[in-house]
């Protein structure tokens, strides 16, 4: 959410190896002061490491502002801060249009599914509605899913990482609340995990 200093704080605490994969969970923009700087930084990281960039609810709204509903969301949930960081609405797409248009809805590995908001537990992964992938909350969080993978997600903020047997949420409200931390989750090959906070 435009919080470049918090992003830099988290990245500075991670010892990276060339074969590490960074999965960015979406909501790079809106609310915070430097949406453009955040996107520049994660694109730059992709020049030295494999990076997966997922779409968040805020990027989804940005890409659909031709629809009145999503224009309302953009205007009322931090979009003006993004416009300020780029200088104009048009500049958002001049500078980073390809980045926003190529964001992925999820990233699947043998052990994990990374997705911004979650999945609808009533449907298999290949039949998910893209709106659910970026906006779903309670139906996903408080239900068991049928996938063999553990689901790593954000979108719904908690005071600390939310962990149950099938999912982990790393959204701590960064960008929404001034004192909230940005949280990263390191998933090691041996199955251990650690959290890093700004």
Residue ranges and their predicted role:
Residues 108, 114-116, 184-188:
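Short, well-ordered beta-strand micro-motif
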């Amino acid at each position: 959410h435009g919080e470049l200093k918090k992003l830099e704080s988290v990245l500075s605490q991670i010892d990276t190896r060339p074969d590490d994969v960074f999965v960015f969970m979406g909501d790079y923009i809106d609310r915070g002061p430097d949406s453009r700087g955040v996107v520049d930084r994660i694109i730059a990281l992709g020049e030295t490491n494999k990076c997966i960039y997922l779409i968040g609810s805020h990027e989804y709204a940005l890409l659909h502002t031709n629809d009145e509903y999503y224009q309302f969301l953009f205007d009322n949930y931090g979009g003006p801060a993004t416009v300020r960081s780029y200088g104009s609405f048009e500049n958002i797409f001049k500078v980073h249009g390809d980045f926003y248009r190529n964001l992925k809805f999820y990233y699947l590995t043998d052990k994990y599914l990374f997705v911004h908001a979650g999945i609808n537990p009533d449907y298999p992964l290949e039949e998910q509605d893209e709106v659910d992938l970026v906006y779903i909350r309670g139906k996903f969080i408080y239900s068991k899913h049928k996938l063999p993978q553990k689901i790593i997600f954000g979108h719904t903020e908690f005071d600390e990482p939310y962990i149950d047997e099938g999912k982990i949420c790393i959204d701590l409200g960064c960008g929404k609340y001034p004192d909230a931390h940005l949280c990263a989750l390191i998933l090691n090959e041996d199955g251990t995990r650690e959290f890093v906070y700004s």
